């Protein structure tokens, strides 16, 4: 695209070759609002997000030493894939997911139905702006591919710090 005021010509563009990840991202955004998935399109979007975030989530979680008795919060839990992966390691602890999309909460609960039914996990509808937990509740807090959706990052990080135990770990 020219910025010199002469307009655009066909020769100004070259054919673009998209990677699989770029195509997946384009499909996500064409199907609705990734910030707050809604309706049937939102459910499909969450399924694709679970798939497209798989590798980065695995890498990020590999940086943590998850203990069996950890109490972990996943902010912006989306379709619940990260919670599911952490549930493999948390045996005596507890996992909590929170998302402000009701479709995300519903999908995450379905993805993790066994852990939810066993009382090992709960998934709540809520916002990072006002986390419904006591101070110093969680050993670890994670957010996967959702920080850029937070409405007021500086204030929201203070809220994360409030519910994170002293010496706890926040994985962003």
Mark where each language-model region is.
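Conserved SAM-binding loop and adjacent beta-strand
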Residues: 41-61
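A short glycine-rich, Lys/Arg-flanked "PGG" loop and its adjoining helix->strand segment in the class I
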Residues: 154-166
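A short acidic, Gly/Pro-enriched loop at the edge of an enzyme's catalytic core
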Residues: 129-141
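Conserved SAM/SAH-binding beta-strand->alpha-helix loop
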Residues: 101-103
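Conserved SAM-binding strand-loop segment of SAM-dependent methyltransferases
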Residues: 117-129
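Conserved SAM-binding loop of SAM-dependent methyltransferases across substrates and taxa
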Residues: 79-91
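A short SAM/SAH-binding and catalytic strip from SAM-dependent methyltransferases
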Residues: 140-152
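Conserved SAM-binding loop
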Residues: 108-109
């Amino acid at each position: 695209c020219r910025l010199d005021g002469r307009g655009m010509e066909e020769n100004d563009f070259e054919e673009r070759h998209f990677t699989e990840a770029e195509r997946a991202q384009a499909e996500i955004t064409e199907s609705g609002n990734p910030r707050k998935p809604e309706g049937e399109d939102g459910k499909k979007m969450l399924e694709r997000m679970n798939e497209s975030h798989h590798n980065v989530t695995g890498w990020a979680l590999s940086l943590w030493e998850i203990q069996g008795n950890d109490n972990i919060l996943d902010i912006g839990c989306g379709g619940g894939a990260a919670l599911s992966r952490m549930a493999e390691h948390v045996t005596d602890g507890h996992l909590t997911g929170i998302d402000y999309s009701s479709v995300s909460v519903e999908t995450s609960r379905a993805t993790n139905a066994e852990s939810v039914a066993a009382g090992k996990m709960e998934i709540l509808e809520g916002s990072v702006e006002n986390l419904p937990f006591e101070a110093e509740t969680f050993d670890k807090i994670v957010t996967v591919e959702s920080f850029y959706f937070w409405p007021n990052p500086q204030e929201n990080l203070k809220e994360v710090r409030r519910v994170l135990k002293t010496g706890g770990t926040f994985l962003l």
